[in-house]
């Protein structure tokens, strides 16, 4: 799987489990809603620093954003 898509899917899955809208997550993370949207659609190529910052804003470890979701069997 493409790493951009994987990170985007994981961000969306975790964000939704936390009950956060893209707008609220943007406020918490410091990234724009447009960036979050593009990221979740697999159109952004986040740096490792960005992955750490997104993970911190979601309250998870950075590895949670780069590993396939076991529930999806990916």
PLM regions: where:
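Short, charged recognition helix plus adjacent turn
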Residues: 2, 56, 64-74
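Alpha-helical residues within the helix-turn-helix
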Residues: 16, 27, 56
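A short, Lys/Arg-rich alpha-helix, primarily the initiator
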Residues: 1-17
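Short, basic-rich loop-to-helix N-cap that marks the start of a DNA-contacting helix
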Residues: 43-56, 72
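Short alpha-helical DNA-recognition segment
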Residues: 20-38
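The DNA-contacting recognition helix of HTH DNA-binding domains
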Residues: 22, 33, 43-44, 62
């Amino acid at each position: 799987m493409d790493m951009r898509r994987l990170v985007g899917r994981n961000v969306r899955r975790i964000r939704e489990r936390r009950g956060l809208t893209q707008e609220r997550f943007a406020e918490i993370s410091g990234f724009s809603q447009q960036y979050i949207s593009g990221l979740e659609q697999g159109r952004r190529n986040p740096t490792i620093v960005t992955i750490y910052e997104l993970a911190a804003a979601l309250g998870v470890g950075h590895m949670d954003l780069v590993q396939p979701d076991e529930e999806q069997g990916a």
